[in-house]
Amino acid sequence: MPVLLIVVDGLSDRPIDGKTPLSVARKPNLDRLAEMGINGIMDTIAPGIRPGSDTSHLALLGYDPYKYYSGRGPIEAAGVGIEIKPGDVAFRANFATVEGEGSIFDKTVVDRRAGRIEDTSELIKALREIELPVELLVERGTGHRAAVVFRGEGLSDRVSDTDPKAVGKKVKRCVPLADDAKAKKTAEIVNEFMQKAHEVLENHPLNRERAEKGLLKANALLLRGAGEMPHVPSFKDKTGLRLCVIAATALIKGVGRVVGADVITPEGATGNKNTNLEAKVKAAINALESYDVVLLHIKATDELGHDGDFEGKKAFIEKLDEKIAPLLDLDFSKTCLILTADHSTPIKVKDHTADPVPVVIVHEDVRRDEVSSFSEFEAYKGGLCRIRGMDLLNIALDLLNIAKKFGA
Amino acid sequence: MPVLLIVVDGLSDRPIDGKTPLSVARKPNLDRLAEMGINGIMDTIAPGIRPGSDTSHLALLGYDPYKYYSGRGPIEAAGVGIEIKPGDVAFRANFATVEGEGSIFDKTVVDRRAGRIEDTSELIKALREIELPVELLVERGTGHRAAVVFRGEGLSDRVSDTDPKAVGKKVKRCVPLADDAKAKKTAEIVNEFMQKAHEVLENHPLNRERAEKGLLKANALLLRGAGEMPHVPSFKDKTGLRLCVIAATALIKGVGRVVGADVITPEGATGNKNTNLEAKVKAAINALESYDVVLLHIKATDELGHDGDFEGKKAFIEKLDEKIAPLLDLDFSKTCLILTADHSTPIKVKDHTADPVPVVIVHEDVRRDEVSSFSEFEAYKGGLCRIRGMDLLNIALDLLNIAKKFGA
């Protein structure tokens, strides 16, 4: 009796001339799900609170983001594959090009992406050899991106970025943002790492090769967004259920890993509009065999919203509609299917907003309503009225009679 | 990109023979706003919790009243113009007539309004000269009303009223309501004030004049509703936004001052049904030029509800509808207009109830719904479904893209 939770990132919108990509898209399968299920609108965090994809996914999995979210760093680090632990301090990082004399902090950023370097695997290996008073974990992300984690006693995330976030500026020294020993110690370690990383990178054969080819050297790692990994109970411990997250996006994979889920990225799943939707849908159907809760994340709608691409978002929704057709054949006497979004990414705003998302829950036992179209203009008329993200999974588990009674 | 929040006090009702003043009033402009906007119902505090106008206005401004409300005293004191500070203990007070021998506590209340005395300004001046172990602040309210504030170390609001709340009863001695030194100290100071105030008033020339004219002496000040002013972050500090409150009612002006708003009472604004609505609407339109959030409070609907005057409430709603016509010409690509109430004051109950209030949010970017009439019987069919007072401003700030993202 599994739950399939399909989260279409940034799916919903604000109207432009009364229309949204979702409302005008041809989407017979999504509409059929609306017709079969019980519909409503949902504030993934709370009304008027603009969700990140990380905070909203935590909430959708039943984790209060106000309690369990401490910034993007730890989630990105988990997303790229670092086995992050409570107390670790994680940073997002990018390989950059710096120039000038003296220490790393005397040098000027020439390019924040090191000439859009693609393969940093050799550089990452070299960085891992750096010796620090605490344990160091480094992992590459896509392109010039990376994650850096410091592990040891008495560290704190109350420290500043070393990334000046602009070219032509000097690399910033990490400073404590709190008047305590932990923050001071962490800042010192970060600065030691910054200098040692620069030395390792500057002298790395790959960078000599790049220089010879006229490419920019990836000779510094700039850090930002320190976050301390909180104590997050695993989904299994919390609910007794096996969770699988199917995603290609590091941030969502990170949320999955932080809560102890198995994370699957099917072949060809990319997190953009050319992703292999068939493979993702197939992976989801397979996962329903061996997991209690399967979260299927679809990213491109959000990107197309950030791009302000109305037609592109509409077209991708139509493609998605086509590709999810096999899900309509699931046995809804056993499976509970939920279709929703993590937040709105309106074309007009090009960023996340708090406009509530449509949600439909399909299962044989739901109280079906009169909604027969999946859109921002119909969902609120449904039998769920307006719910919150933190409540969604509880509603599904209740439907499946997995929920426990509170009281007698 | 400002928010205009129009709060029509006690606007909504319970039906009598299926009708409410709002549902039967002729109100083309209010209905037009409903048609242009997204509608819903709102529990200003929580479902089933009967709001005061003070607690509900705190909630509508985003302040949790369970955290920031400590009784009517401090808010009334702020409302009449006392610059109240955290830790101050404030009382509502009324000038009264007492008779008998001995101390103030041996005397009997003859009239709780001192013959409906109008001008107490000379008496207030004299009271301010009283010497106490702590600082004393006194300010007149309307008619026989006043506010009294004690300021100093170690005071508490856990003390009883001195107002016996009935004629023919003796003035009550203030007693501590908690077994601690602060409450004991405060009660002693209150009792010292009661006696000294009585002496000052009894011998005041104005009271000798009143006696000569056969009027009742205003020879005592009765205190009730002790409240300690809590630490309330200013609206500006909390949100970064400039708030203006347009109101004539002391309680609402007090809420405004407590949160650090600029408070405007336009010429002719009275807080009753003869108030100058044109002036209030004009002041609101002007305020939108220089503030981020403008709260326009309209009081008379509540009074007419307390009076159980169905026809009077209906007639005032029709007048209000006419006078707000200029607001329909606001530029809703910039301004977000919210029309709602702080609570219901049903004709049949003659007091506040928790029946949810209708709310409409008008802005170019809202997801318009099919509601085209502003009433208790239509609002719930709208796209907002059912929200809470604390969420309202967040929803508006999200619409105006002022909201910050929580997460990544």
UniProtKB/Swiss-Prot annotation, chains A, B:
Pathway: Carbohydrate degradation; glycolysis; pyruvate from D-glyceraldehyde 3-phosphate: step 3/5
InterPro entries hit by this protein: Alkaline_phosphatase_core_sf (IPR017850), ApgAM_prokaryotes (IPR023665), Metalloenzyme (IPR006124), Pglycerate_mutase_ApgM (IPR004456)
pH dependence: Optimum pH is 7.1.
Enzyme class of the recorded protein, top EC level: isomerase
Pfam families: Metalloenzyme (PF01676), PhosphMutase (PF10143)
UniProt superkingdom: Archaea
Catalyzed chemical reaction(s): (2R)-2-phosphoglycerate = (2R)-3-phosphoglycerate
Cofactor(s) needed by this chain: Mn(2+)
Role: Catalyzes the interconversion of 2-phosphoglycerate and 3-phosphoglycerate.
Subunit: Monomer.
Protein name in UniProt: 2,3-bisphosphoglycerate-independent phosphoglycerate mutase 1
Organism: Archaeoglobus fulgidus (strain ATCC 49558 / DSM 4304 / JCM 9628 / NBRC 100126 / VC-16)
